[in-house]
């Protein structure tokens, strides 16, 4: 498949959703970003929340299962404010008052809602950061659905839960539709083993390599 666009979500992603002043600090040269961090930050703050992306509905299902709420964007001058809408209380909450896990997921949810399209490549560094094992499995379930709908995903992880969940979603292919449904999954979550590759890097002197 020919990739259209590639997007990188860094491990230190939550700071960009919690602190809108970080861009102005960068403009004033008070802090230094890597090129990847700068591209990531600008993509979030320049989002058009009125234009729903291809994976918008998937992202809404993901955040509902994850937290029962909704990540929303509010325009404030040049940049976006990220807010959390609590469905039960019908109130908007600042990211600074949210759990670390929700802040970590906010960027991934926003990318799925407004940026990513079929044949794009999404690169996520340590998606499991600050996530309870249950929520790690939920994340992988929706990444698998996005993969089945045409998104390419590359992640780096230290989590056995993430790896095991990918393996579980591959093994779902051996079950009937009814058996899959009883496990609270559906056929959109089933991965073909031919579409998944795992690389284990081993350290050797001054560099790391992937054994053949």
Indicate residue ranges for each PLM-predicted region.
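Short, surface-exposed, charged/polar-biased interaction segments
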Residues: 30, 116-119, 129, 164, ...
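C-terminal lobe/lid and adjacent interdomain/linker elements of RecA-like ASCE P-loop ATPase modules
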Residues: 138-212
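Walker B catalytic acidic pair
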Residues: 125-127
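Phosphate-coordinating catalytic segments in nucleotide- and nucleic-acid-processing enzymes
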Residues: 1-121, 187-212
């Amino acid at each position: 498949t020919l990739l259209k666009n590639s997007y990188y979500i860094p491990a230190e992603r939550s700071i960009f959703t919690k602190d809108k002043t970080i861009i102005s600090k960068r403009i004033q040269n008070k802090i230094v970003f890597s090129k990847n961090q700068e591209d990531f930050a600008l993509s979030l703050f320049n989002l058009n929340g009125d234009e729903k992306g291809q994976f918008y509905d998937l992202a809404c299902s993901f955040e509902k299962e994850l937290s029962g709420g909704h990540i929303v964007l509010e325009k404030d001058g040049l940049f976006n404010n990220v807010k959390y809408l609590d469905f039960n209380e019908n109130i908007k909450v600042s990211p600074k008052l949210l759990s670390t896990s929700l802040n970590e997921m906010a960027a991934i949810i926003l990318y799925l809602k407004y940026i990513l399209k079929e044949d794009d490549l999404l690169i996520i560094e340590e998606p499991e950061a600050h996530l309870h094992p249950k929520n790690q499995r939920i994340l992988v379930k929706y990444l698998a659905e996005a993969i089945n709908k045409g998104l390419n995903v590359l992640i780096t992880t230290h989590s056995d839960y993430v790896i095991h969940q990918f393996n579980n979603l591959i093994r779902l292919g051996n079950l009937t539709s009814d058996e899959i449904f009883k496990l609270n999954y559906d056929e959109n979550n089933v991965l073909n083993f031919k579409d998944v590759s795992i690389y284990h890097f081993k350290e050797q002197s001054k560099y790391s390599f992937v054994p053949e």
